[in-house]
Amino acid sequence: TGRVYAGDVLIDDTTAPGQPAAKIKTHTSYGFATQVVILDEEGRVERVLAAHDVGRAVNPALCEGQIEGSVHMGLGYALTEELPCPDGMPATFKLREIGVLRSRDMPEVEVTLVEDPEPEGPFGAKGVGEIGLVPTAAAVAGALYAFDGVRRFVLPMKDSPAAKAMSVGRIRGLKPREPVRS
C-alpha cells in the first residue's frame, strides 16, 4: 500500500494520430552539462567538477548521485572500458575483465546543480540521466592534453597516465590497440 501524491501540473505530450494539434512538442531539451577534470602531478584523475542544468532539483541528493554515477561511467568509457566483439560475440563474459572502474579508482566528484526550471517539465525538472555522461571523455582528453601535450582521439585512452593508474581488469589474450595521435 503506497501513497498517492497528486501534482498540480498535468503533462500531456501526446496527440492521437490524425488529430490536429495546435502546439506540437516533440521533446523537452536539456540545458547543459559541463565538466572539468583535474589531474595530479603524475597525470592521475584527482577530481572532477561537474556543473549540470537539471531544471528544478526536486531531489537534490538524487540528482547529485545520478551525476556522480554518470561521471563514473564516463571515466570508464574514456579511460579503461572495452568490450571487443570479434565475429559479433563478446571476447569475454566476465564483467571484471572489461575495465569497469572500481570504487577505489573513483576520484572526488564535485557536483554543481544549476537550476533553470523547465516551464513545461514536471515540477520544472529536466532529465539528469544520460546527459551526465556526455562531457566526461572530452574533459578527460582535454586534461590529458594539458598534462602531456598528446591529443588522443581513440577511446578508451588506455595509453594515458590516468588510465594506467586505474586498477581495472583486462581481457586475457587481447592485444592492446595502438592509439591514434596527432
Task: Name each model feature, range by range.
Residues 1-182:
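C-terminal catalytic domains of large/alpha subunits in multi-subunit enzymes
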